[in-house]
Every structure is written in structure tokens, then in C-alpha cells.
């Protein structure tokens, strides 16, 4: 099952007993597929049954993606915490995600954000593209369903955050920037969860086997820097250094480059 909703949908994140309304751009996408096991039905006495039979007993992890425009008020900062922070047991912070439309409320249980992509484009609104996974996707009610959690107050205004990138990379000339990008990725591996005993009791999606635990394989930070070519930076394009000190700041338009920036 796969869903993609436009502006009429609302996204909520419930974390630590608190409920956060997250404003997104045009689309929220989420899906979950089920795995099928096939078995032969051809017998010695009936060789005509070439098509195998199948059973569905387990689900793959749920997937989701959405884009959040960042604002000066920072009401959406919870998504940045969920992207970057780990809890004490070296796991990603998990939360329940709800999407409410004009007719339904969907829930992804024990969701984690596995990737966040930032684009630092001069004088553009700063956004973060988020993708992640969860244990189970289900429809929990209609449009009047009450989402649990203590509602966190929102600012009276939502002011788009227009930024420009400020880059420091050792002693290199990082002026005349066209833009920059940054991607934070966490590679996770879901633990095998199916058992023969549980599979025998599966009758439909409500009691199918769902993933429950995962391990973190690795975390990576990647990106790119784009510059106009000038006499001062023409020799910098093929620097293969792997131990450089890099600082990327998203500075609000109108503030000096020495500002600490909204994001660093």
C-alpha cells in the first residue's frame, strides 16, 4: 500500500508524549509492502499446475518522505533533533507519525528518520528533505480521529527563512558560492523477525508479522560545494584532502556573514 497526499493533508509527530504539527511542502509520501512466500503446487499426478501458490505472512518496513520548509520561528526544529540525535543505546530517536487527510488518519509506528538533505541556495527558502522508516503503517481512524499527545504551541506567524551559505574550508577561498548541499544519512538494518510458529497464525494484515528492531550499520555526512571559477580559486577544484576542517553556515539574508547562522 502506497499513499501520496497534497496540501489538504496534515502531518503530526508524537515524541516523548508531545504532539508537534509539522508543516510540509506539497507532498507527503508513505508506503508499506508485504512479503510473499511461494511454494510449488505441481504434483506427480498433476503436472499442469505450473504457477506456484503463495502465502503472505510478513511485512517489510514502512517508508516515508516529506519536505519541511524551515522558518525563523523554528517551530519545526523537532525534526532536526530527530534526524541528528542518538539515544543512550546508540539508536535513532523513534516517534509515531500521523498523517490526517480529509477522510482518514494514518499512523506509522516507531518511525525513525534515516536521511536529511539540506540545500544551501542563496536567497532561497531553507528546506530539509526527510526520509525514514517505521514498523507498521495503518489507518487508525477518519478525519476526526484524536491524535494522542500534549499539543505543543505554535507561533502566531510562519516567516520563511531565506538564507545564503557561508563556507569555511581550511585556508581555501570559499567566496563566490553558487550553493552547497549537505546530506546526513544513517544506514540501518532491520533484524530478522519471522518465525514459523507466528506465520501459522497469520490470517490477514492485522496479525501479520512486522519488523520490530534494527541495528545501525553506519552514519555518513556528504555533500557538495559549487563556486564560480575565479583567479583566486582556480587551483582548488581537485583537492583530495580527507582531513579538512569544514564549517557550513546557513545565514539569514540581511545578516552579516559573521553571524552564527540558523544552521551550522
Report residues per predicted region.
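Signature of extracytoplasmic/envelope-associated structural regions
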Residues: 1-264
Amino acid at each position: 500500500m502506497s499513499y501520496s497526499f497534497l496540501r489538504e493533508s496534515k502531518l503530526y509527530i508524537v515524541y516523548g508524549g508531545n504532539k508537534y504539527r509539522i508543516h510540509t511542502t506539497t507532498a507527503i509520501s508513505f508506503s508499506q509492502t508485504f512479503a510473499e512466500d511461494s511454494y510449488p503446487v505441481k504434483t506427480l499426478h498433476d503436472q499442469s499446475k505450473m504457477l506456484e501458490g503463495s502465502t503472505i505472512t510478513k511485512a517489510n518496513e514502512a517508508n516515508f518522505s516529506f519536505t519541511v520548509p524551515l522558518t525563523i520561528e523554528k517551530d519545526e526544529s523537532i525534526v532536526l533533533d530527530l534526524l541528528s540525535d542518538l539515544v543512550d543505546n546508540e539508536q535513532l530517536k523513534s516517534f509515531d507519525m500521523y498523517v490526517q487527510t480529509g477522510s482518514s488518519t494514518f499512523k506509522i509506528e516507531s518511525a525513525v528518520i534515516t536521511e536529511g538533505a539540506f540545500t544551501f541556495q542563496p536567497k532561497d527558502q531553507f528546506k530539509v528533505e526527510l526520509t525514514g522508516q517505521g514498523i507498521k503503517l495503518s489507518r487508525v481512524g477518519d478525519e476526526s480521529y484524536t491524535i494522542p499527545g500534549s499539543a505543543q504551541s505554535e507561533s502566531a506567524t510562519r516567516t520563511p527563512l531565506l538564507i545564503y551559505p557561508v563556507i569555511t574550508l581550511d585556508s581555501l577561498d570559499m567566496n563566490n558560492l553558487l550553493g552547497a548541499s549537505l546530506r546526513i544519512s544513517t544506514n540501518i538494518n532491520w533484524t530478522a523477525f519471522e518465525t514459523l510458529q507466528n506465520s501459522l497464525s497469520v490470517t490477514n494484515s492485522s496479525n501479520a508479522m512486522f519488523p520490530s528492531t534494527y541495528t545501525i550499520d553506519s552514519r555518513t555526512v556528504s555533500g557538495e560545494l559549487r563556486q564560480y571559477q575565479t583567479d583566486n580559486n582556480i587551483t582548488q577544484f581537485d583537492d583530495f584532502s580527507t582531513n579538512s576542517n569544514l564549517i557550513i553556515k546557513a545565514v539569514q539574508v540581511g545578516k552579516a556573514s559573521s553571524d552564527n547562522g540558523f544552521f551550522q
